[in-house]
Amino acid sequence: MEFDTIAAISTFPGEAGIGIVRISGDEALEIISKIFRPFRKKDIKSVKSHTIHYGHIVDPETGEVYDEVLVTVMRKPNTYTREDVVEINCHGGIVVSSKILELVLKHGARLAEPGEFTKRAFLNGRIDLSQAEAVIDIITSKTMLANRYAQKQLAGVLGQKMKDLKNKIMELLSHLLALIDFPEEDVEELEREEIKRRAKDILNDIEYLIASSESGRIIREGLKTAIIGKPNVGKSSLLNALLKQNRAIVTDIPGTTRDVIEEYMNIKGIPIKLIDTAGIRHTDELVEKIGVEKSKEVLAEADLILFVLDASRDLTKEDYEIFDILSGKNIIFVLNKVDLPKKIDEEELKKLVGNGIIVEVSTVERTGLDKLESEIYNLVFKGKVSATEEEIITNARHREVLINAKKHMESVIEAIEKGYSEDLITIDVNGALNEIGKITGETATEDVINQIFERFCVGK
């Protein structure tokens, strides 16, 4: 596949020790030969692949030296894009790297679009679409566990899984086509039973992957953990204590928190998205009322609720009203302010909590926080919210595709059981095959491909 030559700054803009300008395409070596002056006189166009060269970037028209640089030459096909690639390592900072990029563009390159280097790697067959998505996940990973899964996907683990699944579906299709082409009444019933067995086997594989996607979402995006409670029970103090920094404003005035505050923390490799919410209560104050409504929206989407109660006060009607709207949620009851004289009725608390998890903490004295973190982690790994090393589906797009493939395979099994013709059954088998191809990119539409690469930054 032929493309023009593209270039972009691949490092984060701003003051830094090093900046990198990346060039990819057939004209990469020609362009660098015009603007690079190596200290050891050599023809940069004829140097060996994967070598580094020291010299100056110079404007050939004015003779002005832009910077002292290291130039890396990588020849196709053993490069990130499977094209000739040149990387200019210059001093960091917006001015130097921008001026070098301008010079590169002036001498024949085009400014790369977001994700275009990785898109070329995909279009040139170096990686599949799931591996391209893994690049984004590596860049945005919030913990080493999330990075580990993304690295597995980049290494092709998911692609191989899809290849194995695709082969199973193709074998099923070949059985069906054989029945269509060579119908024999005495063996047809046996063949249909074998086809049904294979279809169920494929369906089981797909269902296993779908089941893993909830754990994968948590590892990729974080466990959405809402800190809920009535005003002035210490929700913002709990957020600050868990983060070990003063992120939220804390006062003795009820209703201080008006908006939702989101921050990430890491518990043994699991990214935890902590969401501090406005205290839930009846109020006529407009801004606080909006905050309460936002709290209820967060509550509906949360994976886990930290329901904060005040140990220094009795349970109130507001506590019970909040508990009533938490039905069906994973809840840890956080009994805060245990450093103060305890006034909460223990029997009443037990009736409210039942068999639920209670953790006593003091955000003032920083006690009980390790216990709370352990309970959050245990909840993740006890199956209520699962996340195990074997799971590999971390992407919402992949989950949606697999759900569609599952529907096709369920239709295949139903059609076999109802005695439909092989011609009709093959329609859904081909449908499942088409869906699986969307994960690796073989059957993904151009719009889907473009949407994926638009999420990248320029230079990647």
From Swiss-Prot:
Ranges for domain TrmE-type G: 222-381
Source domain of life: Bacteria
EC numbers, comma separated: 3.6.-.-
Binding locations of GTP: 232-237, 251-257, 276-279
Molecular-function GO term, any one: metal ion binding
GO BP terms, alphabetized: tRNA methylation; tRNA wobble uridine modification
GO cellular component: cytosol
Textual note on the cofactor: Binds 1 potassium ion per subunit.
Keywords: Cytoplasm, GTP-binding, Hydrolase, Magnesium, Metal-binding, Nucleotide-binding, Potassium, tRNA processing
Binding site for K(+): 232, 251, 253, 256
Positions contributing to Mg(2+) binding: 236, 257
InterPro entries (alphabetical): G_TrmE (IPR031168), GTP-bd (IPR006073), GTP-bd_TrmE_N (IPR018948), GTPase_MnmE (IPR004520), MnmE_dom2 (IPR027368), MnmE_helical (IPR025867), P-loop_NTPase (IPR027417), Small_GTP-bd (IPR005225)
Family under the similarity heading: Belongs to the TRAFAC class TrmE-Era-EngA-EngB-Septin-like GTPase superfamily. TrmE GTPase family.
Purpose: Exhibits a very high intrinsic GTPase hydrolysis rate. Involved in the addition of a carboxymethylaminomethyl (cmnm) group at the wobble position (U34) of certain tRNAs, forming tRNA-cmnm(5)s(2)U34.
HAMAP family: GTPase_MnmE (MF_00379)
Protein name, per record: tRNA modification GTPase MnmE
